[in-house]
Amino acid sequence: EALINRAEAKIRLGDLAGGLADLNVWTQAYLRPGLAKRTFTQAEIKAYYDALPYADKTTRSPKKHLTKAHFKLHDGSTITEGTATEALLQYVLQCRRILTLHEGLRWQDIKRYGIDIYRWKKIDAGADTFEVPADGVLLGSDLRHAIALPQQAITGQIQQNPR
């Protein structure tokens, strides 16, 4: 996980080549030899994510809108859709999602990047049909993302996070 974290930091700082190098070291170690390609170029990653639709209430996809991120990039800008930076961050998030499956760490990425969450519900078992119910969306800006501060901190005159 340290390599993925370092890759994310390098990409956010504008060192796309350094971030990609760390991601390739991780994929070479994580993916089994002979079963899949284990190193990727920036152009290949960008082409892959450019071809995917963004996830929304009607489309299931590993590609998420990252424009609501709660941080700025190294130059003070925000994440722009369709750029190499966005594609590499999408790849970082996908690698981390695979690596930390069932560990509960995805929540931090969801909060940091302001990712909308869609809860898909199977509506027809025979047809393998899914939909997002009306109450099945947690927007990236939803205050339920906020973590409650402990009572000791509130007693010390710190204001509780809005929820």
Model-derived features: positions:
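Acidic/polar-rich alpha-helix caps and helix-coil junctions
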Residues: 1-163
